[in-house]
Amino acid sequence: MFFRSIFTSAMILFSGSSVVHGANSPGCGKDLPRVQEPGGSYSTNITTKDGRERSYIIHIPSNYDKNEPVPVIFSFHGRTRTAKSQEKLSQFSNEEYNPNAIAVYPQGIKNQWQGDPSSQGIDDISFTLQMLDHFEDRYCIDRTRVYAAGKSNGGGLTNRLACDPTASKRFAAFAPVAGAYYQNVTEDNCRPNTVKIQCNPARTPIPMLAFHGTADETIPYTGGGRRGRCLPSVPHFVREWASRDDLGGKNETTTTNGGKVEVSRFGDHGEVVHYRIEGLGHAWPSTEPNSDNPDGTYVDATPIIMGFFDQWTL
C-alpha cells in the first residue's frame, strides 16, 4: 500500500506539472514533426556535430499540446542492450506511469555508453545535450523539468550527466538503476569504499535517486575491481553524493517488506535517496516479471522515479 500511494501521488503531481511550471522552449507552438502523433513512439535519426549518424526512440504523450510545455525524461539502456529494450524495461512510455512527459530512449554506439571500460572515446554527454537542444527547438518542452534515468552502463552515464558542469545545469534530477559507476583506477589499486569519484557538477544540490540489489553479480553492491577499472561500493557512491550536496552524513533509513527493502534518505527534502533491495540481481526493480527478472521483486522503480522527479525543477 505504501508504494501504491507513492505511485498515485506521483501520477497526480506529474499530471499537473505542465500547468504549474512554465519555462517554455522555442518549440512551443510548433506542430509535431511529420509522421509523429500524440500517443506514439518513433525511432528517429540525428546527425551529431562530429558527423555521426545516431538514433533514438521518442514517445509523445497522448495529451501532448504544442502550446503546453511538458517534461522530458531520458532513459539510457544498459551495455549490450538497445533503445527499444530500454523502452520496454523502464516503462516510461507506459502512460499509466507517465501520462505527460515526453520519453526519450537514445541508442548507444555499439550498444554502450561513455564511461564503460571498452567505450571508444565517444562523447555521449555532448550527444545528449545536442538531442536536448533539438527537442527544445522542435517540441514544447518545460526546460526546468528535464530528467535522466538509466540502467547499468546507462545508469553510469546518468551519473556522468549529473557530474558534468554543463549537463548538471540542464537536468533537474537523476535516477540510476544498478548503475555502473566505473572510475579510472586500476583493479590492483581499487578501494571500493574510499575510491575518489570524479564529479564536478555546476550546482548543488543535485537530486539523486539510486536503486541497487544486493545480489547484483554484474555490478556488485560492494563494488571492487572489474574489467580493469574500479567500481565504488554503492554505499560509498551514495554517501559521496550526500557529501557533494552538503547534506551531511546523517540519513533517515526505513525498511519495508520484512526488511528486504531499505530506503535511505539524505537531506531535509530527500535530495539523495537510495533503495537497497535484498536479493535482487542486476535488474530494473518491478513487482511484475520483466526482461531483467522473471520473478519480479518487492518494489516498482518506475513510479518511484516518477514521484522523485516530480519533486525537482531547475
Question: Which residues fall in each region the model found?
Answer:
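A domain-start/cap signature at the N-terminus of enzymes
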Residues: 2-7, 13-72, 84, 101, ...
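Alpha/beta-hydrolase-fold catalytic nucleophile elbow
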Residues: 107, 149, 175-178, 209-212, ...
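Active-site machinery of serine-nucleophile hydrolases
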Residues: 79-137, 272-274
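Active-site glycine-rich loops that stabilize anionic/oxyanionic intermediates
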Residues: 70, 77-81, 280-281
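Structural cue for short, hydrophobic secondary-structure segments
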Residues: 73-78, 105, 210, 276
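Alpha/beta-hydrolase fold nucleophile elbow
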Residues: 140-152
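C-terminal catalytic histidine-bearing segment of alpha/beta-hydrolase fold enzymes
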Residues: 211, 229-233, 239-314
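The feature captures the conserved acid-bearing segment of alpha/beta-hydrolase catalytic domains
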Residues: 172, 178-253, 265-268
